[in-house]
Each structure stands twice: as structure tokens, then as C-alpha cells.
Amino acid sequence: MANDPIHQFQVSRWIPIDVGGVDLSFTNVSAFMVATVVLASGFLYLTSSGRGLIPTRLQSVSEMAYEFVATSLRDSAGSKGMKFFPFVFSLFMFVLVANFIGLFPYFYTVTSQIIVTFALSLLVIGTVIFYGFFKHGFGFLKLFVPSGVPGIIVPLVVLIEIISFLSRPISLSVRLFANMLAGHITLKVFAGFVVSLSSLGALGIGGTVLPLLMTVAITALEFLVAFLQAYVFTVLTCMYINDAVHPGH
């Protein structure tokens, strides 16, 4: 088990729940999603309450997160898109905290599960579609008809735009899932090398130096990837929201 890089992604039932043949068990994934929400909410509450003129380091971090999301949303969707700020900020904090939690030993990375990332992506696309039709009616369909396209190729362009739009939740979810999965597998493999070689005695201990250095380097890289994936997910979400706010190209 120690050297199995896939074992860390196993879903375990903690509280079995069966309702009419539907498995609604509370799993380790469920527990760490709850933990992610609690930690993110607690962090924001502690850093935003009792703010002083001179911000603490943690307060500065929360303000940087706030400004990043606000700037990204404003740049992508304009002032009208700011109504989606609570939604986008919540997504950013959830993905960011979930990614960071998974980097600690014996903790679970919920964003390494495709069902979790796909659910987040469907939430984004569902929000875009709902608001687009709610605000613009059938005018939202102008999203699939770019302006300035010659009439003879409009059907082909519309088909391409529809396929591109429908592929968004797939690309958005797979990008996050694949990066977190691959990074953790690589980290586990090199950590396994260290454990295996150290059990060989003095000769093995000498051979652990390179794998150990690689493990440290990959761990540092994974912290960067954890932030970058939350960053990319948020920026793309802001761009998709712009399509709902301004469906015309």
C-alpha cells in the first residue's frame, strides 16, 4: 500500500447510506469537501473580522484573493459581471483550499476526482446558460453566431461554436483533475523510492538522496500547481460568465 501511487485516490465509505437503492454514503471525499468549506470559511472569517489599518499577513492573503477575483471578473465581464463575484470567489477559494489540503500527508485531494471537478464545471456552465436565457432570452443564442461571418458558412460556424461550448465543462474539469492526479502520483512514486531504498541499509540510504531531493522539488512545484490550477479555473469561469452577460461577439 505504501508504494501504490493509486491507493491515495481510493474512495472509502465512512457512513453507509442507502436510500431506495441509491448509494448516498458519506465518504472520505465528502468529509474533505466539508473540511474544505469549513477551512475556507473559517480563514476568511478570521482574516476579515477586526481588520486594522495595518493588515496582518493572513489578512493580506485574503485581500489579495479578493482583489484577484474581483479584477479577473471585472476585466472579463465588466461591471455587470460583478454580480457573480460571490459565486466566482466561492469557487476560487474552494478549489484553492481543496488543492492545498491534498498536499498534506494522510489528507485527501478531492479535486483529483473527476466527478468533483466535473460537478464544479457543470455548475459554472449551468449558471452561464441559466443567466444567459434569463437575461437575454433567445438573444443568448447569438453567442453561437459570431458577427461578421459570411452567410454561406454560418451553419458550419454555428456547429463549431455549439461543439466548443458543450466541450467547456469537459475541458474545464479534466484540466483540473488531470493536473492534480498526475502531480500526486509523481510525488507518491518518488516518495516510494525513498522509502524502498532506505530499507536497503547504508547503500540504500546513499541512493535515496536524489529521490529525496526530487520529492522536495516536486512538493514545492505541487504547491505552485495547486495555486495555478485554481487561478486557471477562475479565469476561465470569468470568461464563460462574460458570454452570459454579453452573448454577442
Curated annotation (Swiss-Prot):
Keyword Magnesium: no
Disulfide-linked positions: none
Membrane topology (UniProt): Multi-pass membrane protein
Keyword Cell membrane (UniProt): yes
Sequence intervals crossing the membrane: 26-46, 84-104, 114-134, 143-163, 185-205, 208-228
GO MF, any single term: proton-transporting ATP synthase activity, rotational mechanism
Signal peptide range in chain numbering: none
Source superkingdom: Bacteria
Entry keyword set: ATP synthesis, Cell inner membrane, Cell membrane, CF(0), Hydrogen ion transport, Ion transport, Membrane, Transmembrane, Transmembrane helix, Transport
GO CC annotation, single: plasma membrane
Localization of this protein: Cell inner membrane
PROSITE patterns: ATPASE_A
Assembly description: F-type ATPases have 2 components, CF(1) - the catalytic core - and CF(0) - the membrane proton channel. CF(1) has five subunits: alpha(3), beta(3), gamma(1), delta(1), epsilon(1). CF(0) has three main subunits: a(1), b(2) and c(9-12). The alpha and beta chains form an alternating ring which encloses part of the gamma chain. CF(1) is attached to CF(0) by a central stalk formed by the gamma and epsilon chains, while a peripheral stalk is formed by the delta and b chains.
Record-stated family: Belongs to the ATPase A chain family.
Function: Key component of the proton channel; it plays a direct role in the translocation of protons across the membrane.
Protein name from the UniProt record: ATP synthase subunit a
Taxon lineage: Bacteria, Pseudomonadati, Pseudomonadota, Alphaproteobacteria, Hyphomicrobiales
Gene that produces this protein: atpB
